[in-house]
Amino acid sequence: MRHYIDRDVSLNELKPCNFSDNDQFLNFTNRLDRRHWYSIGAGFLQRYYDNPFSEFDLDIFYLRLKINKKIKKVGTIAFQMDRGTAKNISFQKTAVSSDFDRSYETIEWYVPVKLKSFISLFDHVGFSFRQELRYYKAEAANDILHSGRDHTDSKLSFWVDKELWDDLSVIVSARFRSRNTDSAYEWVRDLKSFNQTQLWCKIKWGFSYDKY
């Protein structure tokens, strides 16, 4: 009698897909004039998954350009563009499923707006729109899930903040997300497309510690 652990993919049992991000970013900022400034940067993001999803491990290299504008007595607005390449570092190195290449190219643009609130209940209000276009590199005919697939991921966010005391503030946010997937297979389009609403509250507490 031998004891085995069933490692096969199950259609009924779901597994948590946990991952960690380690983002390293180098940025240069310079002023254009009194109300305009820009930033240029490059980053390296390591996105590694826990078992049994380690075949999705990615090293992501990206470049970023951001232009900011201050509007007198109103607030600020910015435009940001990212261009990145994700390399599937576990491709053909772990389980059988790692024979499928999850590498992709990505382009993302982002427009955040921050305004002074005209309601005394809040200090600032803001909104932003972010859209990512992702193109998978997979060409294997047997990798139906990724081959020839791309998607557009759009996020519309709103937020308000309020400083309660000098060292305590609250931010309440809402985000509406929509992903539209394009594939030659209808079931892939249905599986990887979704709409999502997120609500959250962030409490920020700042303090200083001096030791003489």
Residue map of PLM features:
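Gram-negative and organellar
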Residues: 1-212
